[in-house]
A protein has these predicted regions:
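Flexible gly/pro-rich beta->alpha loop and the following alpha-helix that scaffold active-site loops
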Residues: 2-54
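Small/polar loops that bind or transfer phosphate-bearing groups
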Residues: 6-7, 55, 121, 142
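Amide-donor transfer/coupling interface in amidating biosynthetic enzymes
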Residues: 12-18, 48, 74-79, 84-167
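Short catalytic/ligand-binding loop motif for oxyanion handling, primarily in non-cytosolic enzymes
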Residues: 31, 62-65, 110, 148
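Catalytic nucleophile loop
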Residues: 47-68
Length: 167
């Protein structure tokens, strides 16, 4: 699978049509301390997007804000946290019902009305969510730095992207 990194500042002038799926990464931005509108506007294309999307941390929050979620401050969480799956989904295939993932945030979002809550933790109610009609996922934790379980989750998302190519 080919992967291309597109810096945020290059997003507006990048043709996204060749891509099969998207990962929107974390960012050192506190949405409660800035005007989030420029970021929401930069990602507004997601609202009409049917290809798979995985939002991680900041990406999770942006995905939620686009769909009406609210962002709020919380106790800082910068360690591994036990994540509990509360709704089965292909994103969690081959993972136990409770697994550890690395956290690095001090904000959280509510669950938008057109999303299902998939996972929670003691620190954060909305650890993972999925759009009810699309393969649009958000995870508050950081699978990319969470070892084997994180790798499995990213492999699962990649498999979801590849399954859509065949349709």
């Amino acid at each position: 699978i080919d992967v291309q990194i597109i810096p945020f500042l290059d997003l507006k002038q990048t043709d996204l049509s060749p891509f099969e799926g998207f990962v929107i990464s974390g960012a050192p931005i506190l949405l409660t301390e800035i005007d989030p509108e420029p970021y929401i506007n930069a990602f507004r294309w997601i609202l009409n997007e049917n290809r798979p999307i995985l939002g991680i941390c900041f990406g999770h929050q942006i995905l939620g804000l686009l769909h009406g979620a609210r962002v709020a401050r919380m106790k800082e969480d910068r360690d591994f946290q036990e994540i509990e799956v509360i709704k089965d989904d292909l994103l969690f295939e081959r993972l136990p019902d409770v697994f550890e993932m690395q956290e690095d945030h001090c904000e959280h979002i509510s669950v938008p009305k057109n999303f299902d809550l998939l996972a929670c933790s003691d620190a954060c109610i909305n650890e993972a969510m999925k759009h009810k009609d699309k393969l649009h996922y958000g995870v508050q934790f950081h699978p990319e730095v969470s070892g084997n379980y994180g790798n499995i989750l990213l492999e699962n998302f990649t498999a979801l992207v590849m399954s859509q190519q065949k349709k």
